[in-house]
């Protein structure tokens, strides 16, 4: 059945006579028109299919680009998070360790104050009131200095009786002692200090030798 816009309708063929040349021409024109319409529909279908394929390809391309952008975003976010953590750590380290050199110098001053106090004979200190007051003033100054350093994160290392640790201790000499395990700190010659997790100055110590080895001590206790 023909479309209403087609000039060839059912009524056009009601009285057609195939023997009549004019009617045959009419039928031929109708057939040509139908063929043209059919070919037009095929072309439209082909165009639609092509557009569909192009849309599918475009969608796949967009999906790939979206995935790539997502990966880039995730990598950037991870880099930013690492930078944030590193910045926080650097700021914290700067806050803790910014006074390290100053603290190390103040420890030398503290050592000198202690040496000055040790140089005062005990009897002279007791018999001379002025000397006694001077010594007490020096002691107060030294304590206040160490309290200030401790307030800023400086801690004293007191390793006597502990296992020798080269990261925190400096062995100055050995002490023969068979009663304690080897490498036990027996004497502290000069106190050590740390700030945060860093060593400002290792403790200078004497280390026991000649006692039971650490492994044998652990085996005996087991």
UniProtKB/Swiss-Prot annotation:
Any one GO biological process: protein folding
Function field: Participates actively in the response to hyperosmotic and heat shock by preventing the aggregation of stress-denatured proteins, in association with DnaK and GrpE. It is the nucleotide exchange factor for DnaK and may function as a thermosensor. Unfolded proteins bind initially to DnaJ; upon interaction with the DnaJ-bound protein, DnaK hydrolyzes its bound ATP, resulting in the formation of a stable complex. GrpE releases ADP from DnaK; ATP binding to DnaK triggers the release of the substrate protein, thus completing the reaction cycle.
Stated name of the protein: Protein GrpE
GO cellular component: cytoplasm
Keyword hit for Cytoplasm: yes
Family indicated by similarity: Belongs to the GrpE family.
Keywords on record: Chaperone, Cytoplasm, Stress response
A Pfam match: GrpE
Iron keyword on record: no
Record's subunit section: Homodimer.
GO MF terms held by the record: adenyl-nucleotide exchange factor activity; protein homodimerization activity; protein-folding chaperone binding; unfolded protein binding
NCBIfam families: PRK14140.1, PRK14141.1, PRK14150.1
PROSITE patterns: GRPE (PS01071)
Domain of life: Bacteria
HAMAP family: GrpE (MF_01151)
Organism from which the protein derives: Bartonella bacilliformis (strain ATCC 35685 / KC583 / Herrer 020/F12,63)
Compartment(s) of residence: Cytoplasm
